[in-house]
Amino acid sequence: MAGVQSAVALREQGFTGTVTLIGAEPHQPYDRPPLSKAVLLGKAEGSAFDIDFEALGIELRLGLDVTGVRPADHELDTEAGPVGYESLVLATGAEPIRLPGSDGVPGVHLLRTLDDAERLRPVLAERHDVVVVGAGWIGAEFATAARDAGCSVTVVEAADRPLAGALPAEVAAPMAAWYADAGAELRTHARVERVEPGAVFLDDGSRLPAGAVVVGIGARPATAWLAGSGIALGAHREVLADERLRTSASDVYAVGDCASFPSGRYGERLLVHHWDNAVQGPRTVAANIIGESPAVYDPVPYFWSEQFGRFVQYAGHHAPGDELIWRGDPTTPAWTVCWLRDGALTALLAVGRPRDLAQSRKLIESATLLDPTLTADPAIPLKRAVAG
């Protein structure tokens, strides 16, 4: 996504030089969100971008692995030989974390690529007993698709709640009920001890029948190939980009899931593994490569998830010390949570309340102060909750 958007943004902003897009996968560039939804359920054959790369003068080199980069020489090393560059954009994304001990075990799947989705489609069509490891965003979306297909689904989560790494306990706790409502079993405080063909064994001694096991325990930046390049990496092995998405190497930029950037708005470095970041960042990269007017990247992060019949949206970035305000009852189909810092909205999670989400992005961008009492009233439009 981020690589495609970078190439297109360069052309849209008037870049006339050569643009080459290199990808390890053999498929035409495609969008990832539909993989856990329409593609997985067979409602769509693929999710290729409707982009005429030839008309835009973008050369595609697909199915080509890049093995390294030598910034001093301005060259990439690939399986087909070196490729020179004047400017380089790193947009390698993230790769799923594998379940230890599961490599080579029949029936164990990841869900990150088009090939992954294609391998999982017959699993759903045959209505296997499915065990999902991890109750994060991807785990919940796959469990939703599996239940829609008529599969028996058990979700195993090591933490005490779903989305433990993304949301505080009081916000994530109501979401646990969504699993049972959809006919899926959620097992928390449960760790996988081992996986065998047809079964998952937990650390409490229980055995779960599993015609298929889908692992969704997180992702890490795909940057191992940068070893020895001298390009600075962060604590999560992500590329450290600056406010203009430049790396520590001259003429090398980084964007999307593989890179973190300093946010002036939030006062910390952000690593955002979501679709919107891969769409917005490339525009900044393109502007800085062209160089007519330097651009700073400081977005209001945004993502969405469709799970168990609910549309979940999140904007911004919250911290543990932010004030949490509820808008609505979390046992109902539609509710919102707001986070305030010094009276200003920093983040919002909306379940079935897209208007709250739309209004929140503008309020976050402008650092508008809100009245906590008005903010807590779901009958009052968020934009009307401004402090007097």
Please place each PLM-identified region on the residue numbering:
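Glycine-rich Rossmann-fold phosphate-binding loop(s) that bind the pyrophosphate
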Residues: M1-A2, A24, R112, V133-I138
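Beta1-alpha1 glycine-rich phosphate/pyrophosphate-binding loop at the start
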Residues: M1-E59, A145-A166, Q359
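A Rossmann-like FAD-binding core segment of flavoenzymes
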Residues: T16-T20, L60-T78, V83, A149-A241
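Glycine/serine-rich phosphate-binding loop and adjoining beta1-alpha1 elements at the start
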Residues: L62, P71-A72, E79-R119
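FAD-site-proximal beta/loop scaffold in flavoenzymes
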Residues: G104-H128, A199-F201, R207-T284
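Rossmann-like NAD(P)H-binding beta-loop-alpha module
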Residues: R119-L167
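Mid-to-C-terminal Rossmann-like scaffold of FAD/NAD(P)H-dependent oxidoreductases
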Residues: C258-D356
